């Protein structure tokens, strides 16, 4: 049973694109539109990913930022995350207007993170590639990878854990440490088929 209807997913992707285009072109942050479905005012975690079109998945990323926790209404969080992904991802220069027609927008709506309990060595058995995203926290460090990432890279569960440690700026085997917290979550993912094209729900497997 999906939490997010297909038409809501399309609404969010279109909203993310409009937010990016308006900010990149005019420096203006849009407001949630009138007629926003009331369900999208519920607080949920969300990430917006920008991918370059017609580029292999491992090389396509152009920006990805979001909110792991449900701290903002989903419609507002989508606008914020879209703009941040376009201009504030520290891995990339800000998106230029000339790039807007070559970028595919993807919106991932997250479930609240769930702490994985039990001995650290059992963690790989308690996650599933193709279903779960991961958050790893240790001290001041934290890192998140969305559920679609291990699919795109062909990782198994242990490699997924190691790469999330790496994303957090930690050694790749830190998931074996007792004081490392590992959280899992799921996501409903919607993406444009091509820039400004039809929006579809993205299956993971």
Swiss-Prot record:
PANTHER family: AMME SYNDROME CANDIDATE GENE 1 PROTEIN, AMMECR1 HOMOLOG
Chain ranges of the AMMECR1 domain: 7-201
Protein name stated in the entry: Protein TON_1965
Superkingdom assignment: Archaea
NCBIfam families: AmmeMemoSam_A, PRK00801.1, TIGR00296 family protein
Coiled coil regions, renumbered to chain: none
Biological classification of the source: Archaea, Methanobacteriati, Methanobacteriota, Thermococci, Thermococcales
InterPro entries linked to this entry: AMMECR1, AMMECR1_dom_sf, AMMECR1_domain, AMMECR1_N, AmmeMemoSam_A, Uncharacterised_MJ0810
Organism: Thermococcus onnurineus (strain NA1)
